[in-house]
Amino acid sequence: MGMTMTQKILAAHANLPEVKAGQLIEANLDLVLANDITGPVAIHEIQRLKKKTVFDKDKIALVPDHFTPNKDIKSAEHCKCVREFAKEHDITNYFEIGEMGIEHALLPEKGLIVAGETCIGADSHTCTYGALGAFSTGVGSTDMGAGMITGKAWFKVPAAIKFILTGEPKEWVSGKDVILHIIGMIGVDGALYKSMEFVGAGIKNLTMDDRFTIANMAIEAGAKNGIFPVDDLTISYMKEHGAKPYTIYEADEDAEYEQIITINLSELEPTVAFPHLPENTKTVKEAGEVRIDQVVIGSCTNGRIGDLRIAAKVLEGRKVAKGMRAIVFPATQAIYLQAIEEGLIQTFIKAGCVVSTPTCGPCLGGHMGILAAGERAASTTNRNFVGRMGHVESEVYLCSPAVAAASAVTGKISEPSELFS
């Protein structure tokens, strides 16, 4: 029996001719990632073990992004811990305020992860890099710390679900709608510890930003990882971002999949996930009258330049509804600068939005947009669990940048087409 794309990458990194679903392996790592929340836990363990060196100072990335700019004394201490560790071990890829960004947008932008590589990060949305044809997955802080020391990690080889994408998305339908539709179809545990392997002619109709969004939320279906085949667009993206040499792996024709699901992109509609799980999806048309208090546009899921362009297109010449709060978070400093140069930030501010420096901030209920009891947010983030963005009695509705921007104008969950009819 042949291997899936994910299995081929893992076999190569375990120096094995082949692997099978369920097999336990030890794989070599190309990149190990930590942030200001998960990093200190690993760093303290490394210090406790009295380890003086890391496996490769060029293959570790440290990105303070969750509570930065520092929101309080405790977060400042966390960032100081990561900063001092980076200095002590001469870590090449430490990104300070002013250069940093939300980690899962920053690393591809910096060319630090490419097709065919294996990456672990102590953050569940590390699966984002599957958009580039890499195997990447989230792990706990101690596994990440061990990876920093040894350059290795053990995995159980995942079984796979194949998603055949066909057709072309309608206007205002994006990668966020695709992945919300899929999660709504299979559930938050529908791909538990499996690889979500996206294939099909429809992929050519998805931008890189769409693909990053889809791979990013694979974990919300319980997946070990999500992965896309490498095509001309992938290669162009990697070259544009000065990426290192890459390796292209392709699934065998006789690879085994536990399920094969076909999604016709042309049939999808703008979609929203109701509280308190990403699987609680409805089309916006089905949503009914859902009044909201706040809109968040940004995050590692939807804070890239394509996302901001779509939101600005909707907000151009319009105003945020009276009594509404709209917060925009470009995912990296480079994206922020590009958005300024393209006039997008001017559009947001004229519309009545507030624009923030890159941070994970409100997504995890950290800072910069916390919800009070009884408040509702339409958000382009990736999770809407109870209390995720603030008070346990608040509600989060997950949606695309287009829907979020339209909702900011109307004060309720809305389709952008309503504003252009």
Curated annotation (Swiss-Prot):
The keyword Nucleotide-binding does not apply. Pathway: Amino-acid biosynthesis; L-leucine biosynthesis; L-leucine from 3-methyl-2-oxobutanoate: step 2/4. Its EC number is 4.2.1.33. Keywords: 4Fe-4S, Amino-acid biosynthesis, Branched-chain amino acid biosynthesis, Iron, Iron-sulfur, Leucine biosynthesis, Lyase, Metal-binding. It catalyses: (2R,3S)-3-isopropylmalate = (2S)-2-isopropylmalate. Transmembrane segments: none annotated. One of its GO terms (molecular function) is 4 iron, 4 sulfur cluster binding. [4Fe-4S] cluster binds at C300, C360, C363. InterPro entries: Acnase/IPM_dHydase_lsu_aba_1/3 (IPR015931), Acoase/IPM_deHydtase_lsu_aba (IPR001030), Aconitase_4Fe-4S_BS (IPR018136), Aconitase_4Fe-4S_dom (IPR036008), HAcnase/IPMdehydase_lsu_prok (IPR011826), Homoacnase/IPMdehydase_lsu (IPR006251), IPM_dehydratase_rel_enz (IPR050067), IPMI_cat (IPR033941). Its cofactor is [4Fe-4S] cluster. It is an enzyme of class 4 (lyase). Binds 1 [4Fe-4S] cluster per subunit. PROSITE patterns: ACONITASE_1, ACONITASE_2. GO terms for biological process: L-leucine biosynthetic process. Catalyzes the isomerization between 2-isopropylmalate and 3-isopropylmalate, via the formation of 2-isopropylmaleate. Heterodimer of LeuC and LeuD. Belongs to the aconitase/IPM isomerase family. LeuC type 2 subfamily. This is 3-isopropylmalate dehydratase large subunit. The gene is leuC.
